């Protein structure tokens, strides 16, 4: 049966998916709390703070809808029937100048990642020592170039050969041993294609399953490569354990609000260039050890600025995501590409937290795109 998710105006990647994924993250953690008893169960405050954060995220979405409708006459619930897929191109069709530039940028990102792995002298996925050294300046530049370029390329040009570039980049970034980069590549590309192609449900399901497999495989292999850690959990149990542990760290962040007083956000923005890790500060502030750990999307803001800072952060994320979502429903191209990137990275933040300077850079670009569109906007979508 050829059923398409877009029929009936069902929007799979609406910003509200962040709420759904956060609840799913909680559910994944529960076996380790209530059945395996591997970790201490959280108190009520954890659920309260998560609920408040998600509520303000929804407030941001609602405000975006109001502003776009009232001030810019933009229909924020655009019918998917108005969506047009990019024109199909064969391998031998003429390449425009812009397409060649994008292919060149994607290829440059791939080349830089190959150079990065070659300079490391091995594959970081299979070596904890190499993985600790893999996030070099070359790696950062390659990721900043590759992720936006491949998504814009997929959004603008419907040429099957571009999927090969996507696959090559995905494999190379997976070999660094980090889960977040290959997941961001796969998820952002899926979101971009969802809004620019007529995607059959079976391919969406296959893509989601592939993302889950990559998440399990990269995470499990990377953990097994750490010689000083010994795990008896299988890959699925390990995911549940990590979710429960991360949420327990959030509980500690709730208890230790204002501990870092803005230093965590400052380190996030500058740490890559000063060789300091914001997640180590999270470890020091929550468990009292010099250890790099994650604290969910809510934790860092709580440690820096307390509950008010966390609520403002969630409100702004909801506002930005929904505004870009509404704009990309109309204009596609680069707007869809960056919506895919920001939504994918925000979903990843549900576990890791906003402690990556590159994601804040993408958010800054997203804000500039919104301003650029709205300055010339008086549209009726």
Q: Language model features by range: what are they?
A:
Residues 80, 157-230, 320:
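Hydrophobic alpha-helical segments of polytopic membrane proteins
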Residues 76-91, 164, 169-184, 271-284:
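Cytoplasmic juxtamembrane regions at transmembrane-helix boundaries
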Residues 1-164, 199-203, 217, 312-313, ...:
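Membrane-anchoring hydrophobic segments
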Residues 148-152, 180-181, 188, 192-196, ...:
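Hydrophobic alpha-helical segments involved in membrane association or supramolecular assembly
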Residues 127-132, 213-322:
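Small-residue-enriched transmembrane helix-hairpin modules in multi-pass membrane proteins
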């Amino acid at each position: 049966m050829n059923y398409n998710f877009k029929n009936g105006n069902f929007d799979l990647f609406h910003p509200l998916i962040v709420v759904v994924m956060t609840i799913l993250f909680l559910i994944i953690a529960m076996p380790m709390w209530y059945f395996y008893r591997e970790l201490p169960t959280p108190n009520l405050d954890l659920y309260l703070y998560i609920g408040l954060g998600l509520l303000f995220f929804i407030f941001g979405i609602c405000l975006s809808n109001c502003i776009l409708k009232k001030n810019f006459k933009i229909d924020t619930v655009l019918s998917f029937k108005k969506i047009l897929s990019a024109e199909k191109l064969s391998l031998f069709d003429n390449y425009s100048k812009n397409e060649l530039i994008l292919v060149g940028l994607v290829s440059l990102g791939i080349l830089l990642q190959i150079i990065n792995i070659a300079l490391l002298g091995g594959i970081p996925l299979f070596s904890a020592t190499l993985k600790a050294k893999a996030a070099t300046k070359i790696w950062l530049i390659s990721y900043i170039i590759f992720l936006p370029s491949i998504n814009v390329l997929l959004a603008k040009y419907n040429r099957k050969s571009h999927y090969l570039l996507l696959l090559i980049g995905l494999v190379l970034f997976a070999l660094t041993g980090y889960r977040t980069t290959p997941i961001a590549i796969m998820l952002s590309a899926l979101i971009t294609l969802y809004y620019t192609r007529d995607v059959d449900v079976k391919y969406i399901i296959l893509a989601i399953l592939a993302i889950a497999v990559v998440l399990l495989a990269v995470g499990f292999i990377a953990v097994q490569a750490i010689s000083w850690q010994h795990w008896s959990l299988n890959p699925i149990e390990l995911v549940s354990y990590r979710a429960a542990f991360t949420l327990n760290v959030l509980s500690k962040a709730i208890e230790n609000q204002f501990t870092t007083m803005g230093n965590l956000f400052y380190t996030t923005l500058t740490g890559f260039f000063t060789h300091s890790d914001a997640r180590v500060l999270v470890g020091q502030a929550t468990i009292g050890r010099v250890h790099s750990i994650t604290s969910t999307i809510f934790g860092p803001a709580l440690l820096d600025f307390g509950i008010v800072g966390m609520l403002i952060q969630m409100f702004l994320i909801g506002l930005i995501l929904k505004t870009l979502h509404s704009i990309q429903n109309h204009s596609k191209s680069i707007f869809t590409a960056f919506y895919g990137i920001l939504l994918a990275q925000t979903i990843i933040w549900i576990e890791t937290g906003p402690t990556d300077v590159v994601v804040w850079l993408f958010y800054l670009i997203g804000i500039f795109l919104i301003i650029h569109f709205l300055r010339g906007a008086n549209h009726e979508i």
